[in-house]
Amino acid sequence: MKLIVATYGTEGDARPFAALCRGLMDAGHEARLLADAATLDSARVLGVPTTALAGDIRGTLGSDHAIAGVVAKGGGFNDTARALAKIANQNAESWLRTIIEAGRGCDAILVAGLAAFVGFSAAEYLGVKGIGAGMIPITPTATFPSPFLPPKWVPRLFNGASHGFVNAMLWRAFRDKTNAARAMFKLPPRKAVWTGHPMVYGVSPNLLPMPADWPANAHLSGQWLVRSPVWMPPPALANFLAAGEAPIYIGFGSMTGFDNTRLLDALIEAMAGRRVLFYPGWSGIDPKALPDNFLAIGDTPHDWLFPRTAAVIHHGGSGTSHSAARAGVPSIVTPFAGDQFFWAERLRLAGVAPAAVDGRRPKAEAFSSALDLATAARMRNRAQVLGEAMRAESGVANAVVALERIVAS
């Protein structure tokens, strides 16, 4: 079986697909990952063949671009959809051409993220199966609202309808440029978004129970990750961990555009007297501004680091949310945009996180109260139970089996 995976997003979006590709290769299949050049390092480390898609995701997420403004305003759906569509629309024709070239001779194309619509178009052009994949559960259900809408916005009665609304709005934002790219390859215009295709999710059924009303072609396989190779921490990190009690981890991944000075001030005040590991990521926060109880760190494997922490303060991306839960430690979530509000609520419902802290108006008191709840025995015990269940999952292996069945059908 030969598959290619086409996705576009941050490094955190690409990393699970690198793990999935490695799992496919270990099962005797061919796999190749297509993504932004800056997000392919994890695939290369795993020996996964890669092809770069046009674009500059890190530059696009910088503080002077539209998506940063969306974050600053609080992640409204319409603004988010337009800002994200702008990224894909600028590259639609190039992406479609690259995916078609890489996909010649393949059995199926897995599509995700901002490359999904052109990915399905490439599968149509090549006459192969298009399979949706990802870490955000977008298959319609009455169990929960669309992950792209803050849960508190949607009355339960409208959960099912919210998915159709979001799909229609997303397609409206992507449609014209997607159809223009399709026309370059003599494909007819699409009037509506793709539906009815198989979906494979790198999502834990222990964190998000499988909805009873999902179709048979939607699969929750568990988190996609491969255990990090033997990893040695830098001396500064090793010494810090050995010098005292388990620290608090703070990191907001690829998020930019928020009021980082205000947020950092609130965190520094709330963390007074505590040991803290701080990962600046793409935030633009200067590590020189950190007090002595903070240690700034670089990229560190979450599966190595998080079990050594007392709690994880993060933005609520699917990958970080899963990794913290899998490590058996509580989370404190400060969501900014997109599906981050959804994962903040899933962690709260699972009993492993307090209510989310507002990142637009961060207050030290809010972080202090959340940290008291997160480090209390009840939440720590619940996190340990959930972590044990998630570590027993075989997310990559389950996804490989599901894909084998889908392609063979």
Predicted regions and their residues:
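Conserved nucleotide-sugar phosphate-binding/catalytic loop shared by glycosyltransferases and other
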Residues: 34-80, 155-158
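Nucleotide-activated sugar donor-binding and catalytic core shared by glycosyltransferases
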Residues: 1-11, 16-32, 38-48, 80-83, ...
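Conserved nucleotide-sugar donor-binding subdomain of glycosyltransferases
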Residues: 66-118, 158-195
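Short, polar loop motifs at secondary-structure junctions
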Residues: 34-40, 114-118, 204-207, 280-286
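Short gly/pro/ser/thr-enriched loop/turn and capping motifs at secondary-structure boundaries
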Residues: 40-41, 57-61, 136-143, 147, ...
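Donor-nucleotide binding loops and adjacent catalytic segments primarily
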Residues: 203-311
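Generic beta-sheet signal
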Residues: 34-36, 53-56, 112, 133-134, ...
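Conserved nucleotide-sugar donor-interacting segment of glycosyltransferase catalytic cores
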Residues: 90-160, 206-207
